[in-house]
């Protein structure tokens, strides 16, 4: 299964109409057992400096020997950059498996690319649920797919 093939299929799920609600994200997370509810997260929001703020926090966690997962967007070179689990960027094979599973559970329902990637991150992070999760919000934090966290430790 090729990662690029899966990504193309996921992009075709984008809704035809704009809907800024979080309904699609909640629906898919519910089908997956709400993995986001068992994660300790730090959300980074705002217009500028989110990625650099996450990189500073990552350095602090590295120096403190604290394990972390990171979700950012957009990516610069490869989509894998968005998914860091247990201090390491996910490889192509594992990302393809993760996205394939999420795609099957979604069952063709409309969902934005960012939303399905966010849900996939939460689902993958449940395997490392003792880690601190650094989450970069997308465009609109209030209606952002990352804004469904029950155990948000802090928002920066």
Positions of predicted regions on the chain:
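Non-catalytic interaction surface on structured domains
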Residues: 8-12, 30-40, 57
């Amino acid at each position: 299964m090729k990662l690029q093939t899966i990504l193309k299929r996921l992009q075709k799920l984008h809704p035809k109409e704009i809907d800024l609600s979080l309904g699609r994200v909640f629906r898919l997370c519910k089908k997956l057992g709400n993995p986001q509810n068992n994660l300790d997260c730090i959300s980074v929001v705002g217009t500028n400096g989110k990625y650099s703020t996450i990189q500073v926090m990552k350095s602090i966690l590295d120096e403190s020997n604290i394990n972390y997962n990171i979700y950012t967007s957009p990516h610069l070179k490869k989509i894998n950059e968005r998914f860091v689990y247990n201090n390491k960027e996910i490889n192509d094979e594992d990302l393809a498996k993760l996205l394939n599973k999420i795609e099957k559970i979604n069952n063709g329902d409309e969902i934005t690319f960012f939303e399905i990637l966010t849900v996939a991150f939460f689902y993958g992070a449940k395997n490392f649920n003792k880690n601190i999760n650094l989450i970069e919000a997308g465009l609109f934090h209030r209606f952002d797919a990352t804004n469904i966290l029950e155990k948000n430790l802090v928002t920066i």
